[in-house]
Amino acid sequence: GSNGEPGSAGPPGPAGLRGLPGESGAVGPAGPPGSR
């Protein structure tokens, strides 16, 4: 973006691995900030 303007945050990480049947994993962490 413009000088001094932080980039937008990255997209959420992929879903975590599934645990027991029918149990979805936790969502991954957000991506790193975008470039300035």
Swiss-Prot record:
Residues recorded as bearing 4-hydroxyproline in the entry: P6, P12, P33
Low complexity: bias regions: 15-29
InterPro entries named in the record: Collagen (IPR008160)
Location relative to the cell: Secreted, Extracellular space, Extracellular matrix
Protein keywords: Collagen, Extinct organism protein, Extracellular matrix, Hydroxylation, Repeat, Secreted
Annotated region described as Disordered, given as residue ranges: 1-36
Post-translational note: Proline residues at the third position of the tripeptide repeating unit (G-X-Y) are hydroxylated in some or all of the chains.
Major subcellular location class: secreted
UniProt entry tagged with the keyword Repeat: yes
One cellular component (GO) term of this entry: extracellular region
UniProt family annotation: Belongs to the fibrillar collagen family.
Note: These protein fragments were extracted from an 80-million-year-old fossil. The tryptic peptides required multiple purification steps in order to eliminate contaminants and to increase the concentration of peptidic material.
Function description: Type I collagen is a member of group I collagen (fibrillar forming collagen).
Quaternary structure (record): Trimers of one alpha 2(I) and two alpha 1(I) chains.
Protein's name according to its UniProt entry: Collagen alpha-2(I) chain
Source species of the chain: Brachylophosaurus canadensis (Campanian hadrosaur)
